[in-house]
Amino acid sequence: KRLQSDMDRKLTAYHEAGHALVASVLPYADPVHKVSIIARGSAGGYTLKLPIEERKLQSKKEFIDDIAMSMGGYVAEKMIFGDITTGPSSDLQVATNLARAMVTRWGMSDVIGPVALASSGGKREWGESVDKEYSETISTKIDEEVRRIIDDGIKSAEKVLLENRKALDAIANKLIEVETLEKDEYEKVIIAYGIMPKKKNEEKIMKI
């Protein structure tokens, strides 16, 4: 199934190229296995990344790179077209949910500290028994931390895409041409721009 317009194809190509390139450059993100601009459900395209080896735990550094990768499409759209579409809406949701879990469930916020403010189901742990004003203060701090984490992810993605603009263009143009890049084809493109694919001994120890 081909996208409806040339503009849609170009926009989706840069969006997915943004995801893929950020994942390939940042050290704690999983390697890219496939990139496509063929529509899949409600998404205009998709980027598939898989860990090299199965792991049961994930580190804060890996979560931070995952958020940057999630925002790579948003950043690419803004950088290339000076605007954003509805395309990154699911990416924003993924990044926000992950950032919030880092803060409230896994104690990964330096500001909030190593406390669990939500259960595994996402329910607040400080509940009705806690003073309302105190509860609102915590909620505000959580929101501020979530925003900061996402903003940091955006800045990280921006740095990658600005420093590797030629690679971004090359990935997007190749996607416009062939629509889908499998792992080997994708890696040939990035290698041409000095970006080395991730190998097993380079991968980090912890991952969910």
Region spans (language model):
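Interdomain coupling/hinge region of P-loop NTPase helicase/AAA+ cores
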Residues: 1-3
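Soluble catalytic regions of large protease machineries
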Residues: 8-14, 20-208
